[in-house]
């Protein structure tokens, strides 16, 4: 792909088409661009378009496409081809900073993101001059350029907030601080001075305050891991200026917009974050500045309005107070009763009120409301911050705080009782205040795990929550209904079971509520209750206890999916899945109707998949339907195949990537349900499963391997007779998988199934080549994971084909190789094998080598007999060796490249653990004793002599125990 005008024209046309709303035009254009992105110069063509195109829409589109291209392809994944040639990488890094800084802001942001993606992989080792190039631009005096540098630096350095400490991180941050801290501080001071100079110039102030926000964010990132010496030495400069900015009020920077935070609010919010960071992590060094910041932030809180634009500022300011009041040596600032009352009255209660903006979100933007309220993304809301402050104050002042707030709760409930339809917000605030007060520790999985004992949660539930939920009208006071349901969710471990049981039909009833929030909360509450565990770790609620409600529960759950705004509601689908799981055979009478509804839903959502969690829970529900029904009646599998195969065919033909791994897992489950041979409908699919294109997607691999294993388990004879020409393709898949460090274990799963199930004569001609491939991989890239899998495989091979066959195949590849494998791999590494079935396979295989392999008794291999026995006793008795060499620690932790669909394991499609030696050997220790006894009868005197002279005392003692347990002796 040359950088010619003609070549620029083609991507321009296709980029235009990617913006077309018509999928018939848009998708082919997207596919075309994906198909050419592997060509050399492709990324440079996009950058050239950015520079030369006259059409601004094309420029923006090219910048987004370039960023996504970098996101998908820049990372070099081990065992995979480099997707961007080295020349293009060098050219991109040479040009991108200049291009980013000279572009308009909209494009600058995209290129800045691209730089940070490249930087995450290449900086500092492969891009050492990036920092110098950026710092030099500070001298330009052009704040468009300076802000571009700051924005890029922010996206590059913000990962320091989340990284674990390591030598590599320390080296990188030191390099960054040495190059960046002083120029950043000088820029900070210069920008503050310019703000004074241009105090009456609104447009100049807007640019300067944008810079100050980015500088403050960078301060946070650079100080997050440790307090750098430079910033400790310059704390006076930073903190004095931060304090000045916190108390600054410039009319020119105030906005009329009530929703969107202005620059002044954003800057003050970030400064509150910075002060909280220092108060929490560097309190000793920060101590002398703290009282000034507490005063400034308190004044800020009592003078800031209730408008939405101040939400982030107020929540960060409250979070600052929350972080301070939790520290033991600041508690004197809060211990006065008047101070606590004042905080409650002026900060906490006002910020717990349900505002008009919250009501609007509840009604019109329910998805976002639920995300914030249920999923904990409410980190920057006033209510969440106020709740955290209550918890912080309760750490040292639980009694006084509970007393003060109880008074507020009672007066709010009295106000509500006077006129519920007008004063319902008072009750909402009261419930929230009780929740904040009572919640000491909380997790998503278990709700409240530690509660304030001064609050009677059950009494509040009976008096103030149940009456709202018992009301006949599920659509009345929707916010209070949602509050009540959430109360059940949060305090499900504190409210007694009998009260929760009373709640279940009420929650089922609220699945019919028109409010998306209410019926979503009802579904979520039911799902959480159904997962609760009792004292014996069984589910707290039994199927028998829920039996009276089965029909109405299933009816209302599926009806809820038809309510406006909830057609792909993940909480409802998760509740369906959980109900199936809890109720088991009680759902069988309803399955014919429900599987039709699930199939129709699957067909609809597969046209345009947009809700991954919904899709996952739906697939789980389908698996549960199959499992539960076919457990009672295996012949019913045919009905499921009739219902599902048409939709599956459409998904596979349309290459719906999001659903293909699910389809393969469900098909595996269906196929495994067949007890006899493989139906012809499956065999027709078999050749297609071996197509290389399917195996190129990482997300498909585990599901495809599982499906091929099901084919091998159920139909190995059919494959050997009717599809023998496909065996090389099957082994080709194994060869591809074994070459990858990320997927080699999947290759072994497949190989083990081939060895275990295929008729020996069908794979005879390929056996030697299989071993050669494995040895090549061992030679080129030996990892702990590979060795463990290799050990299981050779022992399974030994069990299947015999110990002599294993010795002969090794020595057939290279003379004396069998001895090398024993000495260098089996004996020293067997301790690393994990998993009960895997250990059992290895134990039975090694027992065969010891007792059924003549060369082990009368050749040069005899010297390895006792060390091999010693290693087997070690496998039985010693702890597993789970040490991993340093260089391998991150070998399996690979991000899924780019936008490929990651594999999502379906729990209810799960394969039962298969034990290939289960029928042959029950107890491998007894089996070893019996096999040694048998060997000793064939060669009297030799085995006791070898054992007593070479086995260490501890191992010998264990062995004598096995012999006694088996009631045998060595002759």
Curated annotation (Swiss-Prot):
Entry similarity comment: Belongs to the XPO2/CSE1 family.
Segments traversing the membrane: none
Record-level GO BP terms: protein export from nucleus; protein import into nucleus
Modification Phosphoserine occurs at: 112, 931
Stretches assigned to the Importin N-terminal domain: 29-102
InterPro entries attached to this UniProt entry: ARM-like, ARM-type_fold, Importin-beta_N, XPO2_C, XPO2_central
PANTHER family reported for this sequence: EXPORTIN-2, IMPORTIN-7, 8, 11
Pfam families in the cross-refs: CAS_CSE1, Cse1, IBN_N
Name under which the protein is recorded: Exportin-2
Role summary: Export receptor for importin-alpha. Mediates importin-alpha re-export from the nucleus to the cytoplasm after import substrates (cargos) have been released into the nucleoplasm. In the nucleus binds cooperatively to importin-alpha and to the GTPase Ran in its active GTP-bound form. Docking of this trimeric complex to the nuclear pore complex (NPC) is mediated through binding to nucleoporins.
Main localization (coarse): cytoplasm
Molecular function via GO: nuclear export signal receptor activity; small GTPase binding
Keywords linked to the UniProt accession: Acetylation, Cytoplasm, Nucleus, Phosphoprotein, Protein transport, Transport
Location relative to the cell: Cytoplasm; Nucleus
Positions where N6-acetyllysine occurs in the chain: 574, 824
Superkingdom classification of source: Eukaryota
Residue numbers bearing the N-acetylmethionine modification: 1
Cellular component GO terms, alphabetical: cytosol; nuclear envelope
The protein's assembly and partners: Found in a complex with CSE1L/XPO2, Ran and KPNA2. Binds with high affinity to importin-alpha only in the presence of RanGTP. The complex is dissociated by the combined action of RanBP1 and RanGAP1. Interacts with CFTR.
């Amino acid at each position: 792909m040359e950088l010619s005008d003609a070549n620029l024209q083609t991507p321009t046309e296709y980029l235009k088409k990617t913006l077309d709303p018509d999928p018939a035009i848009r998708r082919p254009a997207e596919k075309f661009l994906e198909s050419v992105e592997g060509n050399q110069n492709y990324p440079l063509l996009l950058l050239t378009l950015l520079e030369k195109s006259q059409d601004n829409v094309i420029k923006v589109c090219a910048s987004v496409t370039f960023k996504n291209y970098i996101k998908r392809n820049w990372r070099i994944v081990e065992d995979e081809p480099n997707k961007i040639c080295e020349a293009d990488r060098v050219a991109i890094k040479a040009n991108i900073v200049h291009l980013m800084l000279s572009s308009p802001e909209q494009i600058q942001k995209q290129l800045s993101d691209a730089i940070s993606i490249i930087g995450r992989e290449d900086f500092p080792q492969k891009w050492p001059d990036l920092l110098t190039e950026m710092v030099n631009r500070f001298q330009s005096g052009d704040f468009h350029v300076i802000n571009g540098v700051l924005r890029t630096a922010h996206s590059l350095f913000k990962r320091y907030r989340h990284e674990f400490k390591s030598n590599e991180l320390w080296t990188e941050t030191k390099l960054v601080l040495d190059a960046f801290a002083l120029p950043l501080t000088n820029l900070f001071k210069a920008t503050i001075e310019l703000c004074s100079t241009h105090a009456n110039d609104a447009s100049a102030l807007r640019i300067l305050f944008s810079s100050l926000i980015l500088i403050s964010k960078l301060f946070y990132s650079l100080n997050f891991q440790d307090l750098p010496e430079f910033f400790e030495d310059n704390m006076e400069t930073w903190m004095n200026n931060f304090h000045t900015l916190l108390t600054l009020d410039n009319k020119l920077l105030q906005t009329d917009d009530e929703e969107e935070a202005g620059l002044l609010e954003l800057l003050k919010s970030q400064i509150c974050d910075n002060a909280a960071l220092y108060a929490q992590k560097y309190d000793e060094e920060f101590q002398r500045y703290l009282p000034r910041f507490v005063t400034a932030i308190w004044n800020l809180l009592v003078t800031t309005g209730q408008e939405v634009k101040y939400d982030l500022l107020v929540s960060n300011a409250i979070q600052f107070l929350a972080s301070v009041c939790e520290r033991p040596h600041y508690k004197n600032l809060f211990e006065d009763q008047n101070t606590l009352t004042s905080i409650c009255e002026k900060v906490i209660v006002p910020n717990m009120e349900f505002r008009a903006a919250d009501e609007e979100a509840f009604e019109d933007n329910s998805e976002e409301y639920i995300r914030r309220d249920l999923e904990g993304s409410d980190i920057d809301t006033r209510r969440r911050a106020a709740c955290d402050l209550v918890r912080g104050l309760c750490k040292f002042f639980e009694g006084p705080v509970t007393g003060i707030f109880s008074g507020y709760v009672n007066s709010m409930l009295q106000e509500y009782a006077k006129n519920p339809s007008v004063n319902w917000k008072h009750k909402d605030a009261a419930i929230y205040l009780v929740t904040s007060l009572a919640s000491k520790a909380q997790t998503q999985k278990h709700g409240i795990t530690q509660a304030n004992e001064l609050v009677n949660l059950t009494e509040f539930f009976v008096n103030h929550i149940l009456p709202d939920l018992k009301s006949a009208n599920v659509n009345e006071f929707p916010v209070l209904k949602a509050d009540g349901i959430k109360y059940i969710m949060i305090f499900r471990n504190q409210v007694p079971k009998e009260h929760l049981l009373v709640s279940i039909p009420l929650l089922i009833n609220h699945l019919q509520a028109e409010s998306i929030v209410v019926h979503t909360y009802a579904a979520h509450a039911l799902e959480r209750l159904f997962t609760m565990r009792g004292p014996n770790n069984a589910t707290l609620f039994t199927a028998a206890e829920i039996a009276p409600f089965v029909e109405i529960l299933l009816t209302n759950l599926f009806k809820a999916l038809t309510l406006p705004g909830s057609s792909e509601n993940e909480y409802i689908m998760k509740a369906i899945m959980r109900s199936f799981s809890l109720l088991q055979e009680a759902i069988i009478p309803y399955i014919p109707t429900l599987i039709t509804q699930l199939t129709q839903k699957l067909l609809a959502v597969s046209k345009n998949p947009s809700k991954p969690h919904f899709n996952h829970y739906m697939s789980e529900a389908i698996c549960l339907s199959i499992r539960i029904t076919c457990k009672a009646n295996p012949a019913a599998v045919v009905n499921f195949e009739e219902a599902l195969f048409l939709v599956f065919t459409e998904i596979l033909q349309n290459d719906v990537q999001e659903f293909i791994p699910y389809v393969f897992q469900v098909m595996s489950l269906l196929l495994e349900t067949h007890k006899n041979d493989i139906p012809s409908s499956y065999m027709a699919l078999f050749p297609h499963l071996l197509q290389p294109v399917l195996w190129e997607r990482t997300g498909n691999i585990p599901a495809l391997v599982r499906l091929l294993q099901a084919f091998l388990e159920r139909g190995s004879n059919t494959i050997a007779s009717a599809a023998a020409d496909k065996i090389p393709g099957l082994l080709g898949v194994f060869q591809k998988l074994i070459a990858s460090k990320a997927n080699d274990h999947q290759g072994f799963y497949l190989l083990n199934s081939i060895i275990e199930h295929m008729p020996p004569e069908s794979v005879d001609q390929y056996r030697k080549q299989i071993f050669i491939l494995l040895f090549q991989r061992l030679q080129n890239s030996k990892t702990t994971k590979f060795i463990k899998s290799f050990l299981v495989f050779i022992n399974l091979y030994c069990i299947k084909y015999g110990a002599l066959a294993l010795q002969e195949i090794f020595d057939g590849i290279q003379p004396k190789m069998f001895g090398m494998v024993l000495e260098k791999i089996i004996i020293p590494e067997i301790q690393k094998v994990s998993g009960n079935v895997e250990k059992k396979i290895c134990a039975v295989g090694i027992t065969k080598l010891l007792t059924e392999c003549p060369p082990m008794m009368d050749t040069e291999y005899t010297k390895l007999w006792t060390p091999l026995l010693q290693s087997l006793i070690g496998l039985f008795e010693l702890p597993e060796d789970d040490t991993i060499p340093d260089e391998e620690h991150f070998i399996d932790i690979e991000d899924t490249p780019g936008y490929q669909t990651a594999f999502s394991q379906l729990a209810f499609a799960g394969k039962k653990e298969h034990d290939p030696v289960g029928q042959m050997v029950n107890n491998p220790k007894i089996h070893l004793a019996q096999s040694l006894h048998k060997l000793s009868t064939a060669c009297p005197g030799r085995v006791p002599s070898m054992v007593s002279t070479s086995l260490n005392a501890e191992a010998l003692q264990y062995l004598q125990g096995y012999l006694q347990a088996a009631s045998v002796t060595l002759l």
